[in-house]
């Protein structure tokens, strides 16, 4: 998601820190979207659906009970969702229950800022091997924000010098939450890749 966007940005500026990239449904969209004057769907962060998420709960169990049967959480691995509830909230400063560790307004502002972060000038020069895991893409004609669909441009992998495209239509944008072992396997495989040696000894 945004993590994939961030590590791609960092790798594009300094590859010394990377041996292999595993981009899990990264928020790197169709390049045309970054050029569109209407790319900002919401005028203010407060209008973004993420900013309107419920953020206050009596405790982690209350959060679990509220969302366990709802989409997209019902699709997640149960242990992952339990961890999300147990570790994704922190005590409120006023002592009245718990709140999301990442305030919804902050999360929304990060996603809105992404529309001003075009990485396509950096991507073609990245030599680091890349794997792009992506789910079923979003409908470009839809005006509804579907958080389960992939924001990743389907042609993204082809823009890197050395990349593998892994299409996972049976999964949603929440790939690590649904199949953590699959993601772990790709990370383990990437970690075993030997660094490219430049020059001669």
Language-model features: locations:
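The alpha/beta-hydrolase serine catalytic core
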Residues: 31, 38-73
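Conserved hydrolase catalytic core segment
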Residues: 1-36
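Short aromatic-enriched loop/helix-cap "lid" or pocket-rim segments at secondary-structure transitions
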Residues: 32-37, 143-146, 178
């Amino acid at each position: 998601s945004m993590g994939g966007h961030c590590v791609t940005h960092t790798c594009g500026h300094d590859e010394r820190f990377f041996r292999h990239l595993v981009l899990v449904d990264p928020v790197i969209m169709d390049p045309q979207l970054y050029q569109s004057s209407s790319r900002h769907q919401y005028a203010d962060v407060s209008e973004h659906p993420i900013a309107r998420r419920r953020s206050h709960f009596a405790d982690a169990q209350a959060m679990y009970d509220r969302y366990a049967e709802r989409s997209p959480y019902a699709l997640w691995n149960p242990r992952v969702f339990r961890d999300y509830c147990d570790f994704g909230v922190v005590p409120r400063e006023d002592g009245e229950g718990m709140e999301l560790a990442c305030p919804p307004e902050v999360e929304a502002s990060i996603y809105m800022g992404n529309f001003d972060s075009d990485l396509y000038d950096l991507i073609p020069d990245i030599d680091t091997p890349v794997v792009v895991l992506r789910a079923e893409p979003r409908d470009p004609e839809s005006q509804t924000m579907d958080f389960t669909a992939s924001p990743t441009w389907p042609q993204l992998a082809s823009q890197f010098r050395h990349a593998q495209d892994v299409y996972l239509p049976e999964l949603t944008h929440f790939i690590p939450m649904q199949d953590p072992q699959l993601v772990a396997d790709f990370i383990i495989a990437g970690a075993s890749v030997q660094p490219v040696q430049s020059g001669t000894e």
